[in-house]
């Protein structure tokens, strides 16, 4: 289970969620999306109003759309309004072959949490 370090009010201005790959094959997609949702709910519960949350996925079988949906579902479950400040993707040293779109596996969001 995800554990945050103790603090006086247990709320943070900045949280970075960068887990290992949750799915390495298509059969694990559903559980991976549940995992991303659970992880992000915990992040949204622990961030202060006006905080910034960085959240990432390196799971090849999780599309950008699936990842965004898991994060948006988490925000709704946590009762938080969020705005996307920036969408992140893999850098030029991780080129994507047009014949292998699954090679686009690094993805992230920078979110402002209201």
Set out the residue ranges of the language-model regions:
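C-terminal catalytic and target-recognition region of SAM-dependent MTase-like enzymes
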Residues: 11, 52-114
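S-adenosyl-L-methionine
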Residues: 1-16
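Helix-to-beta-strand junctions that scaffold the AdoMet/dcAdoMet cofactor pocket
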Residues: 47-49
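Short, well-ordered secondary-structure micro-motifs
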Residues: 5-9, 25-28, 66, 97
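Mobile active-site "lid"/loop adjacent to the S-adenosyl-L-methionine
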Residues: 12-42
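Amphipathic, non-transmembrane alpha-helical secondary structure
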Residues: 2, 6, 37, 41-44
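Short charge-dense sequence patches
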Residues: 1, 17-26, 61, 98
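Short amphipathic alpha-helical interaction segments
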Residues: 31-35, 45, 59, 63
